[in-house]
């Protein structure tokens, strides 16, 4: 028994020695053992003598998936007079749990949930007051609009309807960009619209009265900042802006802007128009903010046109409006006995109907309209 144990103990060292010898042999065959991973000291592998088989490129095109929007909170801020109807505003939060409203009655003598220090500067006083009072509790997105639901300066393809614009507005687009003018159509306001410090005889003074005072106002509002040679964005003082973008400017500056509005000798119309062409500079730093109309519609509202069809639509609409003008002129001059004029009116109306039919066909082919 003792001899067997002695043989076992003698065999263990021999076995260990054999294993060490074997690994030393392998090490000599495969290169030095790596004791640390210093990549720079590692020798480069020689190029393969036979090229590897390269997989064929996948030529199938996969369009990007739809943008997933998070449920951003939004507040619709409205400036209104007592007699203006804002029932359309009241109904919107009922359909959207992430939307609230703040309707400011600027000419009310009674206590109201939202009010302003003074009815001055049109919607500007409301917008600034809302930002000042809610600076630390803003929704993700603030939407600033006028009181009227249907108006000419709203978007054509949303039936000029403020409620439809709010419903279709894509929150992610505002969160990504910080600021969006709610009007997609460039005219009036873009491009090359207001030229501060121009001569008194300039056409700008006749057509854009705020051009005569905006240079002076700029110097008061932004002392030390050079006055841009031109200021442009689509009219008419309606926009959406993210909370992050608003807070890039200290609250104290908004207070100073409102103090300027309270103190300025400019009348309401002019002080409001001055700010109409300042908001975009304030929130984007761009003197001219004139996005491509089809991009605004598609990314801002989900209404996506073929650019050629978009241009064709407005070409046809221009022709239709010209004929409609002729009809109105003939109708104002015609008498019941004027058969020739009556026939001409009928002919023009028929052409107008045909053009409207073509416009409807384009709208029917456009993604997002009517949804």
Place the predicted regions along the sequence by residue.
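ER/Golgi luminal nucleotide-sugar-dependent glycosyltransferases, focusing on the catalytic module
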Residues: 2-371
């Amino acid at each position: 028994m003792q001899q067997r144990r002695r043989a076992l103990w003698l065999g263990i060292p021999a076995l260990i020695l054999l294993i060490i010898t074997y690994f030393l042999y392998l090490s000599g065959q495969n290169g030095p053992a790596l004791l640390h991973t210093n990549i720079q000291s590692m020798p480069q592998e020689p190029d393969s003598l036979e090229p590897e088989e390269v997989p064929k490129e996948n030529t199938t095109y996969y369009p990007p998936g739809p943008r997933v929007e998070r449920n951003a909170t939004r507040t619709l801020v409205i400036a209104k007079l007592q007699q203006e109807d804002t029932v359309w505003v009241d109904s919107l939060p009922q359909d959207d749990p992430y939307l609230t409203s703040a309707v400011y009655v600027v000419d009310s003598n009674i206590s109201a949930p939202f009010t302003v220090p003074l009815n001055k500067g049109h919607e500007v006083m409301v917008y600034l007051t809302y930002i000042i009072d809610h600076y630390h509790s803003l929704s993700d997105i603030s939407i600033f609009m006028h009181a009227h639901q249907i108006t000419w300066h709203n978007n054509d393809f949303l039936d000029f309807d403020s409620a439809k614009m709010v419903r279709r507005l894509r929150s992610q687009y505002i969160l990504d960009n910080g600021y969006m003018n709610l009007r997609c159509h460039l005219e009036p306001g873009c491009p090359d619209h207001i030229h501060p410090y121009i001569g008194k005889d300039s056409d700008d003074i006749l057509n854009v009265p705020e051009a005569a005072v905006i240079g002076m106002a700029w110097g008061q509002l932004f002392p030390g900042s050079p006055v841009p040679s031109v200021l442009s964005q689509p009219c008419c003082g309606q926009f959406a802006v993210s909370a992050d973008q608003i807070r890039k400017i200290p609250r104290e500056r908004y207070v100073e802007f409102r103090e300027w509005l309270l103190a300025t000798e400019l009348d309401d119309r002019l002080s409001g128009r001055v700010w109409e062409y300042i908001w975009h500079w304030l929130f984007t730093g761009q003197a001219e903010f004139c996005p491509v109309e089809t991009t605004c519609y598609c990314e801002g509202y989900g209404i996506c046109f073929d650019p050629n069809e978009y241009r064709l639509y407005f070409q046809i609409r221009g022709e239709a409006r010209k004929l409609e003008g002729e009809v109105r002129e003939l109708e104002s001059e015609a008498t019941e006995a004027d058969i020739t004029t009556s026939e001409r009116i009928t002919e023009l109306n028929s052409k107008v109907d045909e053009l409207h039919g073509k416009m409807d066909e384009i709208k029917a082919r456009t993604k997002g309209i009517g949804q």
